[in-house]
Amino acid sequence: MLGAALRRCAVAATTWAGPRGHLHSARTPGPAAAIQSVRCYSHGSQETDEEFDARWVTYFNKPDIDAWELRKGINTLVTYDMVPEPKIIDAALRACRRLNDFASTVRILEAVKDKAGPHKEIYPYVIQELRPTLNELGISTPEELGLDKV
């Protein structure tokens, strides 16, 4: 299918219509010109919010996740233009606890607060939703540690 599209593009690139509608042959372009003429669009389906959440919860729930994968996942998640759902943060905090990485738990909570930006109601909501997990895992928030005053 791609080959047929490339051939059509190559033929279209080598001919042009004159002022009276007659087709004229032009110089034959190189293969790069034919390839550049093809537009490749993704026909894949868009990921729903539920699928996005499930993908990240599954990622952080991997039993063999290591510290590098944890940090990579957190860094990737932080680059998105949104605040992660509490269930994703819960899975990330549990992964931190499995790895005994307390510093990453604080960084995650700080990143969530930063991602909330001027919307002051988001961070307290996330903490409220995560409170049972924070208590279960013995994780203190940056505010409880006094890091918000530094």
Curated annotation (Swiss-Prot):
Q: Quote the InterPro entries the UniProt record gives.
A: Cyt_c_oxidase_su5A/6 (IPR003204), Cyt_c_oxidase_su5A/6_sf (IPR036545)
Annotated membrane topology is: Peripheral membrane protein
Has keyword Signal?
Answer: no
Residue span of the annotated presequence: 1-41
- Per the record, GO CC terms? mitochondrial inner membrane; respiratory chain complex IV
The sequence motif named SIFI-degron is recorded at: 2-17
Subunit organization: Component of the cytochrome c oxidase (complex IV, CIV), a multisubunit enzyme composed of 14 subunits. The complex is composed of a catalytic core of 3 subunits MT-CO1, MT-CO2 and MT-CO3, encoded in the mitochondrial DNA, and 11 supernumerary subunits COX4I, COX5A, COX5B, COX6A, COX6B, COX6C, COX7A, COX7B, COX7C, COX8 and NDUFA4, which are encoded in the nuclear genome.
* Database matches in PANTHER family: CYTOCHROME C OXIDASE POLYPEPTIDE, CYTOCHROME C OXIDASE SUBUNIT 5A, MITOCHONDRIAL
What family is this? Belongs to the cytochrome c oxidase subunit 5A family.
Q: What is this protein called?
A: Cytochrome c oxidase subunit 5A, mitochondrial
Organism field: Symphalangus syndactylus
